[in-house]
Amino acid sequence: MEGFSCSLQPPTASEREDCNRDEPPRKIITEKNTLRQTKLANGTSSMIVPKQRKLSANYEKEKELCVKYFEQWSECDQVEFVEHLISRMCHYQHGHINTYLKPMLQRDFITALPARGLDHIAENILSYLDAKSLCSAELVCKEWYRVTSDGMLWKKLIERMVRTDSLWRGLAERRGWGQYLFKNKPPDGKTPPNSFYRALYPKIIQDIETIESNWRCGRHSLQRIHCRSETSKGVYCLQYDDQKIVSGLRDNTIKIWDKNTLECKRVLMGHTGSVLCLQYDERVIITGSSDSTVRVWDVNTGEMLNTLIHHCEAVLHLRFNNGMMVTCSKDRSIAVWDMASATDITLRRVLVGHRAAVNVVDFDDKYIVSASGDRTIKVWNTSTCEFVRTLNGHKRGIACLQYRDRLVVSGSSDNTIRLWDIECGACLRVLEGHEELVRCIRFDNKRIVSGAYDGKIKVWDLVAALDPRAPAGTLCLRTLVEHSGRVFRLQFDEFQIVSSSHDDTILIWDFLNDPGLA
């Protein structure tokens, strides 16, 4: 290697003196040593490089002899010799060798793997890249581009996003490109090439950005269902999925609507009072009424399967999940039920502690949370049904709440919304803006959506609301005004809000298909 002697003979005294000239204290930069330091235009120093040296007279002859001996040794001998040789070198020589070795130690393993028949490993490695990195990988060289193309890595990236993100999953269903994912054969039987998915990805991102912008700016399309109640008007409760909307009405009926055609598919009758609350899953619809009963219906046939008689006044709210149901009533009590089946529902425990009507309940595996006209939120242990703590802060009765993870969001007749940490009972934020009682509230990871007796629906920034540094005036993103009466209930997802009102209508606010963009 140029720049140092490679003789196998012990160094002469003069050679040792020359090599040890920079030994400790090693001054890299002196007036007499063999290094020079250049200055860059900005005043910083460049790397230190050796000056050109004249090679000794015997170097060329001895170099070939060194190489000849070196090649005759075993690999272990070669390594030991090089280590010994390096240990005798000066600091700047180490730097010179390091610069020489760096490119030799770099390996394009993505290109090397297919050459050994290991394409699948190269594809698997690159499949962990995000979109920006995958774009860069395509530009490295032709072989990297071939690996990304043959491995259908854009398809795999989109599939990964659909599996892990509900917004992507919803877009796949609504836009129709979900049929080209997860090894499903498309209708024409032909699998699109990688370029199809490469072009699809930015279109998905554009859709997502449009949805976010529409939510913030209030751009939406609107569909309206007129419930046409024959007696008293008002839609007290609802729940929806992609196919249907189930609504509970003031005229004592449950109406099921086709979400696409907006036509009424079925009317369930049996309650003798207004239907105030409901929930359904893939098997049953469970409803609570001002007639003090809870009724269970077959979700597919509409047949009434069970009637639960326990509360002595109106059943104001209910929730069920994983074989358990919780109901609450104007009679100030909370009932906890075990659900073995639709026809086998037994009362487990009655929770008493509120001093006024219990308007709403929610629960998970850890806590049952209830809110009342007595201005308090109470927390109960789900397993033992024992009381845990009370959340105090609202100035008037509480009409609605939702609980998930550590967060409770509540709405009150004091016209405010409060965010609570359920573990310590602290109020994290107070949201002000509604002019009358806040009747319904829902939240997800990004937003809070509230409806009130002022007829308005407000969209709030949840992330900002949880940041104590965020100014109060920036938290309400948009106010939606279309209902002509009190807003009783709402539900929302990434794409839409569905709301019901005292004006006897159900509104579908679609933030994906903004007519202004058509």
Curated annotation (Swiss-Prot):
Membrane-spanning segments: none
Pfam families given in the database record: Beta-TrCP_D, F-box-like, WD40
WD repeats: 230-258, 270-298, 310-338, 353-381, 393-421, 433-461, 482-510
Residues covered by region (Disordered): 1-24
Gene Ontology annotations of biological process type: Wnt signaling pathway
Xref: CDD domains: F-box_FBXW1A, WD40
Keyword Transmembrane helix found: no
One term of GO molecular function: beta-catenin binding
Amino acid composition bias (Basic and acidic residues), ranges on this chain: 14-24
Domain F-box: from-to ranges: 119-157
Subunit structure: Part of a SCF (SKP1-cullin-F-box) ubiquitin-protein ligase complex. Interacts with fbxo5.
Biological role: Substrate recognition component of a SCF (SKP1-CUL1-F-box protein) E3 ubiquitin-protein ligase complex which mediates the ubiquitination and subsequent proteasomal degradation of target proteins. Probably recognizes and binds to phosphorylated target proteins. May participate in Wnt signaling.
Name this polypeptide is given: Beta-TrCP
The species this protein was found in: Xenopus laevis
